[in-house]
């Protein structure tokens, strides 16, 4: 009987121990689950906060990007050309290459030191100068804008009415250096400073060659009739108190052509009237292109246009 009571007592103790262990395990699991859930919640909250913070930064970054100054040069097309006295006025149609601002507007283009060059369909540079758009920022209507640029007679190398606008190419380059000061332009046009003198000389020399070829047919009619000669110059020639270079020679041609719409350029070595006196003659000659019936009529033309005997002579090309 004592042995039976001992077994019952032992079983009771074991049961109590097992119950305590079960309670401890349940309590431990509850604590572990609570801690894990809290950790996951905090992690999710942290991740959500991080994502929200990332969106804010992205939005701020975009706004900051949109509000940056427009430094990319716009694309350009040549709309039309005209003249102001002897200067060339080019109307350009610009298309912005910059993003819109956060207000939905296209950022203004107001870079300084922007070289604008116009080329013909053969790739010849026929106008080039450096403009400061900070003085007259380009304001876009949507993504486009129209601007007027004025080129002096030392900045363009093609008579304004011989420029083919439909086939011309316009190139804008930022970060370029000009020489001298920009002059004043008429109306709303913006004036620019000169490009490098060596580049200008090269463009002027090419322009003289182009002009000679272009004017050949117009010159041919003066084999049989008279016209008036207004200038004869060569590169390196000393006259009128200065040394003449290609830019000077072409500038004089442009100025004379504004005064006399029929003015043409010829090469003295191509025509008998000059080679008879000097077989090695090599001058760029400006003719008024106006027809006169006689030497006397030509002299009268010179006088009526304000030229003295040293500046105007009656010639034919035979």
What is the meaning of each model-derived region?
Residues 1, 5, 10-318:
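Acidic/polar low-complexity segments and flexible, solvent-exposed patches
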């Amino acid at each position: 009987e004592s042995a039976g009571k001992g077994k019952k007592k032992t079983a009771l103790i074991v049961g109590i121990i097992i119950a305590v262990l079960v309670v401890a395990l349940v309590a431990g699991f509850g604590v572990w689950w609570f801690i894990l859930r809290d950790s996951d919640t905090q992690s999710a909250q942290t991740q959500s906060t991080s994502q929200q913070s990332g969106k804010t930064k992205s939005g701020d970054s975009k706004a900051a990007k949109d509000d940056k100054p427009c430094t990319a040069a716009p694309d350009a097309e040549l709309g039309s050309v005209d003249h102001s006295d002897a200067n060339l006025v080019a109307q350009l149609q610009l298309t912005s290459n910059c993003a819109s601002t956060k207000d939905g507007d296209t950022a203004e283009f107001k870079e300084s030191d922007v070289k604008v060059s116009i080329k013909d369909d053969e790739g010849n540079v026929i106008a080039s100068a450096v403009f400061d758009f900070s003085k007259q920022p380009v304001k876009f209507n949507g993504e486009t804008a129209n601007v007027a640029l004025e080129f002096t007679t030392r900045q363009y190398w093609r008579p304004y009415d011989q420029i083919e606008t439909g086939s011309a190419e316009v190139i804008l380059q930022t970060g370029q250096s000009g020489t001298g000061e920009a002059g004043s332009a008429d109306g709303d046009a913006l004036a620019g400073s000169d490009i490098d003198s060596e580049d200008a000389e090269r463009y002027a020399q090419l322009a003289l060659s182009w002009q000679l070829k272009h004017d050949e047919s117009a010159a041919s009619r003066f084999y049989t009739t008279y016209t008036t000669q207004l200038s004869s110059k060569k590169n390196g020639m000393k006259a009128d108190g200065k040394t003449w270079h290609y830019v000077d020679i072409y500038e004089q041609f442009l100025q004379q052509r504004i005064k006399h719409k029929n003015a043409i350029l010829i090469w003295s070595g191509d025509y008998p009237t000059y080679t008879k006196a000097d077989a090695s003659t090599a001058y760029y000659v400006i003719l008024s292109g106006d027809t006169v019936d006689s030497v006397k009529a030509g002299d009268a033309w010179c006088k009526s246009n304000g030229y003295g005997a040293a500046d105007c002579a009656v010639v034919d090309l035979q």
